[in-house]
From Swiss-Prot:
The keyword ATP-binding does not apply. InterPro entries: FAM210A/B-like, FAM210A/B-like_dom. Keywords: Coiled coil, Cytoplasm, Membrane, Mitochondrion, Transmembrane, Transmembrane helix. One of its GO terms (cellular component) is mitochondrion. Residues 118-230 form the DUF1279 domain. It holds the Pfam family FAM210A-B_dom. Residues 95-116, 247-273 are annotated as: Disordered. This is Protein FAM210A. May play a role in the structure and strength of both muscle and bone. Interacts with ATAD3A. Belongs to the FAM210 family.
Length: 273
């Protein structure tokens, strides 16, 4: 009994020492890149860091070879992709996203009706769009009609037509009405006030005169008629398709160049290893 007590104590000390060594090796493996293997039959540990010389036990070498074969047979994980394949995936996603956005842009373009015929928008918006599209026709028509309007109001004020009660009825401020009453140039100011009040009517007359003038000029060949909406949209679609195809070819060329560069880098790294 006295001989067995020290033997058991020595065995326990040996086991605790081996367990501590195993724990240290596992903790070290967490912070370094390498392959850590434990032989189950005996407490033999083989640690093989990447690209470093190591001393292995004969029984652990066989276990290490088997483990390497198993790791080579396993498919690579998603998070551990090689650099070339990772860049290829990113470039392909960029090409697909750019093509999808460019294909969506022509379909999003809506048909824009003629502002002279579109009555769904307000009068001011119609006047503004007509000015952008038919400015060369609208400006002379607007100047002529505005002169006629102002001349009519001025002639009425000279002939003694009292417009001040009408202005008071419309709700103009008293300061403006007093200026029109007491000013020496009351006729001109009265005509101008009536001219500004009649702005909606003036815009309507201008748009009507512009549409009539445009039709007259087109019928006599002085102004080119716009193409039908379908043909216009088809032409724009063909132009956008050509631009998209050119951009796709450029992106494909860039992608192939980058893939070749990455392949060369990967092959060079493999040769060095």
């Amino acid at each position: 009994m006295q001989w067995n007590v020290p033997r058991t104590m020595s065995r326990l000390a040996l086991r605790t020492f081996l367990e501590a060594q195993k724990a240290r090796l596992f903790d070290h493996h967490r912070s370094t890149k390498g392959l850590l293997l434990v032989h189950r039959g005996e407490y033999r540990v083989a640690w093989t860091p990447h690209l470093r010389k190591q001393w292995l036990h004969l029984s652990a070498v066989q276990c290490l070879a088997k483990q390497r074969n198993l790791l080579d047979a396993q498919p690579p994980q998603r998070g551990a992709l090689p650099q070339g394949r990772w860049e290829q995936d990113i470039l392909s996603k960029r090409v697909l996203s750019s093509s999808s956005t460019s294909q969506e842009t022509p379909s999003e373009k809506k048909e824009e009706p003629d502002p002279l015929q579109d009555k769904s928008i307000s009068l001011y918006q119609r006047f503004k769009k007509t000015f952008r599209q038919y400015g060369k026709v609208l400006i002379p028509v607007h100047l002529i009609t505005s002169g006629i309007w102002f001349g009519t109001f001025y002639y009425a004020s000279i002939k003694g037509v009292n417009v001040i009660p009408f202005l008071e009825f419309l709700g103009l401020p008293d300061s403006v009405v007093d200026i029109l009453k007491n000013s020496q140039s009351g006729n001109a100011l009265t005509a101008y006030a009536m001219f500004k009040i009649a702005t909606p009517a003036r815009y309507t007359v201008t748009l009507g005169g512009t549409s009539f003038t445009v039709k007259y000029l087109r019928s006599h060949g002085y102004m080119s008629t716009p193409p039908p909406v379908k043909e216009y949209l088809q032409g724009r679609m063909e132009e956008t398709k050509e631009l998209i195809s050119e951009k796709m070819e450029e992106t494909k060329d860039r992608l192939t160049e980058k893939l070749q560069e990455t392949k060369e880098k990967v092959s060079f790294k493999k040769k060095v290893e």
